[in-house]
Amino acid sequence: MPRPTVEELRLTSFKSYRRAVLPLAPLTVLHGPAGVGKSNALDALAVLSRLALGEEIAGSLDGLPERTGPLAGPVRGGLAGCVPHGRDAIILGCTVRSPHGLIRLDAVIRTDGPVRIARESLTLDGRTLMDTGEQDVRNRRVNVCWHNDTRQGDIRAPFPSGTMITAQLPLRVAGSSAGECLVLAASEDLLTALREVFPLHPVPALMRGWARADPQARLRSNAANISAVVARLSNECQRRYGQLLRAVQAVAPHPLLGLALAERETAGVQRVLAVFDEGVLGRTGADQASDGMLRHLAFAAVLLTGAGVLDLDVATEVPWAHRQLTVLAEDLGAGLSVEQAAALLRLAREMAERSQLRVVAALQEPAAAREALAGASGGGAVLVECRRDPDSGFTVLRPQVPRVPVQGGRGEAAGAGAGGRSAGGGSSAGTRAVPAGGSSAVGGAVPAGGAAGAGGAVLAGGAAGAGGAGGAAGRDAVDLEG
């Protein structure tokens, strides 16, 4: 059974984005200089993931210090930082591919007055399963209508507007009819896909400290407790520990014999520190290691271990085989050479091809991605250029096709090139900005069904499936932007 996965992110009004669409493949790499908005796209998916946990919107985005887990700290910039300058609304959406079909979520969050859901809709293959109506701003309620295929028709009821409506459906819909069961199945698939999102932005300054030993240590988003996680892996799974060691050895600029641990006791608390064993050169602890090696260690650990050792609030009621982890790798190439960053991306591609996880990575220079993704086919990877429109200042996304190395002689290559242009209706090297309508074109039209064309078109992940990105819900959302 296919696992629910996010295949498209719609950034209608969020930070530096206006009416932008990001197609998501098993491995998606965004590149561009600092300040163009790569991190903003990762933040958008992180925001949807937080809202899917069912907590109040303001607390979900500003952080809940009394909590542990992904909501303990704020999303970058907090709630106020997510609202575009001069606006009073966040408008986001996504499309999830599930065993039941393409599920489309669109949400408008207003921040003028009480933070609230102003509009939210959920559709499955174009059929509306849930939609919102009139608001009672003073009492923070919104009328919700959901699908029901009995004689009494669709059901309406007021819901609290301070929380994502879709996250409330499993607690409010009885499931007493086939229609309601479909609503529950679609909402649970969407929530499962969003809750399995893990933002990873390693901070080397925090990773150098001694970590409290914990046999159940879960890596935090800043990787501050990486030493405790390495200790857990060394005791729990020698196979993964060995894979992690080989991944680190592959990029080390000097012979590396092992990945060890130093231990000490402070005030009755056992603490550990990851150590790079360099043989005759000595042992370098995490407190002395370079920023790049520490960041590489954190990224490799996440790619090789999966959700079981991450600080996630996963849908434990859903069997592991029906869940799919998505890693948001922030600034993946920082402190690494092109070859080292390419090695990480090759590892990410390998794990994505095995359906172990999905990765959305951001880096500045595309050289490492082009090297790692050379020969990628079948829609397994998408390279997306991020830039700022010089007139509006908004971020523009330009998906690109990973280039496949030419096989055979020049004559064969020329013939293949001519054939590709004829079949695709244009040069396969061309790129265009992704329009708000949800379909992108790279050397030709992109199929909405999510299958790669023979000409190598970028996958749109079924963007136009559930009513199209320019549907009524999207238009109403823009009208509510204010």
Residue ranges and their predicted role:
Residues 1-16:
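N-terminal pre-Walker A segment at the start of P-loop NTPase domains
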Residues 104-242, 246:
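Electropositive, glycine-dotted interaction segments
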Residues 242, 249-253, 257-321, 331-339:
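Conserved ABC ATPase signature
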Residues 19-25, 319-321:
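Phosphate-binding P-loop
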Residues 26-69, 223-224, 291-306, 347:
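Phosphate-binding glycine-rich loops of NTP-binding sites
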Residues 43-114:
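Conserved P-loop NTP-binding catalytic core
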Residues 9, 325-328:
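Hydrophobic positions in the central parallel beta-sheet of the AAA+
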Residues 342-438, 460-462, 467-482:
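C-terminal lobe/lid and adjacent interdomain/linker elements of RecA-like ASCE P-loop ATPase modules
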